[in-house]
Amino acid sequence: MFWVTFLETMRILKPGGLFYLNAPSNGGFHRCPVDCWRFWPDAGHALVTWAKYNNLDVALLESYIAHDENGGNDFVSVFVKDESYAQKMTDRIIDNYSNYYNGKKYGSDQILNNHHMLNKIV
C-alpha cells in the first residue's frame, strides 16, 4: 500500500513541491541486483522509477540513513515533483549533516559514507 500512497502524494504536489520521507531502516544492505523492498539507498530510485512508470515526473534529490547510536536508524529521502526543478534546488541536508551513511544525491550514482554493503544476499 505504501507504493500507492507515494504515487498519490507525488500526484497532488504542485510542480516543484517537495516530499520528505522518513522511515525506519535496519538490517543488512545487499544488492542482488538491487535492494528496494526495504528503505535502503535503492529504495528512493525504485520509487522514482515507479512514479515515472505511472506517468509522474519525480526526482530524488537526496536520501540517506540517519545513524542512531541506539540502533533505530531512519531512512530519509527528499523527492521533488517535476525533475526540471531539481537543478534549481541545490541545498541538501547531507551537505550539513555528518551522522549518516549510504547517502545519495541527485545527479550521482555514488553512495556516500557507504556502510553495510554486503556482496551476498542477507
Regions of interest found by a model, annotated:
Residues 3, 7, 41-46, 73:
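A structural signal for well-ordered alpha-helical segments within the folded catalytic domains
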Residues 30-35, 62-66:
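Active-site rim elements
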Residues 32-57:
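Conserved Class I S-adenosyl-L-methionine
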Residues 53-69:
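Conserved S-adenosyl-L-methionine
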